[in-house]
Design a protein with these regions (language model features):
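Short, flexible segments with low predicted structural confidence
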Residues: 35-36, 77-78, 152
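Membrane-embedded catalytic cores of phosphoryl/pyrophosphoryl-handling enzymes
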Residues: 60, 90, 100, 104, ...
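N-terminal transmembrane-helix/juxtamembrane module of multi-pass inner/ER membrane proteins
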Residues: 3-73, 87, 103-126, 260-262, ...
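Hydrophobic transmembrane alpha-helices of secondary-active transporters
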Residues: 72-80, 249-253, 315-319
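Generic transmembrane alpha-helix motif of multi-pass integral membrane proteins
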Residues: 76-82, 142-146
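Interfacial segments of alpha-helical transmembrane regions
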Residues: 80-99
């Protein structure tokens, strides 16, 4: 019970910037270790990228491009939500939702073609500009970099985005202009989400007492996604439904925020347990939604991903009470 009470008080550390990513001042060793780990991961990614460029290996390009796939964002967002900072985790999901919704619309506005299909090394659909993988990854990583202001995280962000962007060109599904456009729009979305949700506008839009997630961003994502479908766009039908459902599920976050913040400031074993449980449930549900969509229709992605998002929040919220009360 003592651990439970201490963890309950710990969520207040959000307003001081204290988290697993930002250790308390004076804890220089832990801070340096975090940067060292992040930079080491960046080095591994950079080496793999270099080898891919030199060998032009399709397998390596596919491995690097997987860093920008849907499953990667599910795992990474849950990791931030449960292990580091609950509000930052939700903000990262909002960045993915906003950027993913916007790129569907941008592709139709610019209507620029991809490289010839005969050159493709993996299946692709829709127009080429901007690169969706590149834009969404840039939004996700730039938001986290702005939030935590760590050198190691900034280095990792650059390495991941560079790897994803280069892999899209290496797989011949995008031109260089496409990935550069994705980076530009991704930075814009990441900066806007940071400013509105975790930066200067947070107090105004979210409400300082409970740190409510700005309602405007999920609503905007739903509107853009639905419009992309109503306009008969040739790209992004399934993605539109997924993003819309996920965005609506995040409206429940203000109701569960305090409990989820307890998890992100709980002892390491509790946080890891929460991360594993939430990730397993989320991945199982997303795979189940694919089977259901094949049997019923792509529209089912909307309610399915609403359920996925809501389940992520509920599991993360329940983990502290299920574990800490037994300690």
């Amino acid at each position: 019970m003592g651990l439970w009470l201490r963890a309950l008080k710990a969520h207040a550390a959000f307003d001081t910037g204290v988290s697993a990513m930002n250790p308390p001042e004076g804890d220089d060793r832990k801070s340096l270790l975090v940067d060292y780990v992040l930079i080491s991961i960046s080095a591994v990614i950079t080496v793999l990228l270099t080898v891919a460029v030199v060998t032009d290996s399709t397998k390596l390009w596919l491995a690097l491009t997987s860093l920008g796939e849907e499953s990667a964002y599910v795992v990474l967002s849950i990791a931030v939500l449960t292990l580091i900072d609950a509000d930052a985790g939700v903000a990262s999901l909002l960045a993915v939702i906003a950027s993913g919704s916007l790129v569907i619309w941008l592709k139709e506005v610019f209507a620029l073609p991809r490289p010839p299909e005969a050159l493709w090394r993996e299946p692709a659909e829709g127009y080429g500009f901007p690169s969706g993988h590149t834009q969404v990854s840039t939004s996700f990583w730039s938001l986290l970099s702005l939030k935590f202001r760590r050198v190691g995280l900034a280095v990792l962000s650059v390495a991941v985005v560079a790897a994803i962007a280069t892999s899209r060109v290496g797989l011949h599904v995008h031109y260089v202009r496409d990935v550069l456009g994705g980076i530009a729009f991704g930075l814009l979305v990441g900066a806007c989400v940071w400013a509105l949700v975790v930066g200067p506008g947070r107090r105004f839009l979210m409400g300082s007492p409970v740190n409510r997630v700005a309602l405007a961003l999920p609503v905007l994502s739903v509107v853009v996604s639905v419009l992309s479908f109503w306009e008969g766009y040739a790209y992004g039908f399934d993605t539109s439904f997924k993003l819309g459902g996920l965005a609506l599920s995040l409206l429940a976050y203000p109701l569960l925020a305090q409990r989820i913040r307890v998890l992100s400031h709980a002892p390491a074993t509790v946080r890891v347990s929460g991360f594993i449980a939430t990730t397993v449930v989320a991945l199982v549900l997303t795979e189940a939604s694919k089977l259901l969509a094949e049997a019923v229709g792509i529209w089912v992605y909307g309610p399915a991903y609403f359920f996925v998002g809501l389940t992520i929040l509920v599991v993360a919220a329940l983990t502290p009470s299920l574990i800490l009360k037994r300690l």
